[in-house]
A protein has these predicted regions:
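Bacterial N-terminal signal peptides
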Residues: 5-20
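An N-terminally biased module of ancient metal coordination in phosphate/nucleic-acid-related enzymes
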Residues: 25-96
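Histidine/acidic residue-rich metal-binding segments in metalloenzymes
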Residues: 27, 58-63, 83-88, 94, ...
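Hydrophobic faces of well-ordered beta-strands that scaffold small-molecule active sites
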Residues: 41-45, 73-75, 99-102, 130-132, ...
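Glycine-rich phosphate-binding "P-loop"
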Residues: 43-52, 135-137, 142-159
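Active-site environment of divalent metal-dependent phosphoester hydrolases
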Residues: 48-50, 80-84, 105-108, 137-140, ...
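Short acidic/histidine-rich active-site segments
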Residues: 233, 268-285
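Mid-to-C-terminal alpha-helical segments outside catalytic/metal-binding sites
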Residues: 286-322
Length: 322
């Protein structure tokens, strides 16, 4: 190549680079995609170690949630406390809030104030949520086993038991979150009422509209008026006769249409959406959150209401905003 030809080639290359720069300025590339799960706090996360099949362990969940921009997760286990696990995960996966708690099934002594007292004292201060009995509650075993089955109760005849009273006092004193588990809807109302009287600030009705506890709208309005939030879990979007997982075929489906109706009747300010995911062969927690957001938007629920249900309400319950 002659010197003249080489100079022409350089000039052409420079012009091409200039054209490319001008094009980039006129038509800049789109901004990086932001996950619909960004900033969300999932207050209902199942993971290994567990006695039930799970698709990820605590570290996997935290790392994936962080990578998708989520603000935090709450680890839930039906048979053991998760405050200690949350504290360790926080050390290994910085940059995401991880909390735990305790579910009051028989493995921890049932309705056991001592278990709650020790849980919230565990090193790291990550023990935040106290769930009432789940698969061993009287409501759960009667619903899925039969009417003659008997399980744990917290407020027979509409009055909380002495043990339940003591637990509410601890929750109020330590500013924990009281989640109602799978107890009877009448027990939910009684516990929320007594909790309010004792000064419990943060009460969450665990997946309130599905099979357990199965609140009707009047009961939902009653507890919402007393300051409780009602949880809706994406897992229940997947439930019903055509559910992808066999155990979900026995649960009542609660989907985005139900959320839209509840938001109209009691307000998004009284609702909280989480995943309740982690089961073997099920989708990941962030995928579930993203799917939930998509379905809520498709149903016409306002972005501001989605922000309230998935970000603001969980943050307030966990003491992350003020």
């Amino acid at each position: 190549m002659t010197r003249i030809a080489f100079a022409v080639a350089l000039a052409v290359a420079a012009l091409l680079r200039l054209d490319d720069a001008l094009a980039q300025a006129a038509f800049p590339p789109p901004p990086p995609k932001v996950s619909p799960a960004a900033g969300v706090i999932d207050m209902h996360v199942h993971s290994h170690p567990d006695v039930f099949g799970r698709n990820m362990d605590d570290l996997d969940v935290a790392q994936l949630a962080k990578a998708r921009g989520m603000r935090g997760i709450v680890l839930k286990n039906h048979i053991s406390e998760t405050a200690s696990r949350a504290a360790l995960v926080m050390k290994v996966v910085p940059g995401i809030e991880v909390f735990g708690g305790i579910v009051l099934n028989t493995a921890v002594g049932g309705i056991n104030p001592s278990a709650v007292e020790w849980m919230h004292r565990i090193y790291g201060g990550r023990g935040k949520v106290v769930w009432l009995p789940t698969f061993e509650s009287d409501k759960h075993v009667k619903t899925f086993t039969g009417p003659n089955a008997k399980g744990l109760t917290v407020a027979p005849n509409g009055q909380v038991t002495p043990e339940m009273e003591a637990i509410l006092q601890i929750v109020a004193r330590e500013n924990l979150v009281l989640a109602t588990g799978h107890v009877h809807p009448e027990e939910v109302v009684a516990v929320v009422r007594r909790g309010r009287e004792l000064g419990v600030k943060n009460m969450l009705v665990t997946h309130g509209f599905t099979s357990v506890p199965g609140l009707n709208m009047a009961q939902a309005k009653e507890v919402a008026d007393m300051g409780a939030l009602i949880e809706v879990c994406f897992l229940q979007f997947l439930a019903g006769p055509n559910a992808p997982l066999p155990f979900l075929t026995h649960w009542t489906q609660i989907n985005a249409k139900h959320v839209a109706q509840a938001a109209k009747e009691i307000g998004a300010k009284s609702l909280l959406i989480s995943s309740d995911l982690g089961q073997s062969a099920n989708m990941t927690h962030p995928d579930g959150i993203e799917a939930a957001v998509g379905q809520l938007k498709k149903e016409g629920i306002a972005d501001a209401d989605i922000e309230t249900m998935l970000r603001k309400n969980p943050a307030r319950m966990l003491g992350l905003d003020g």
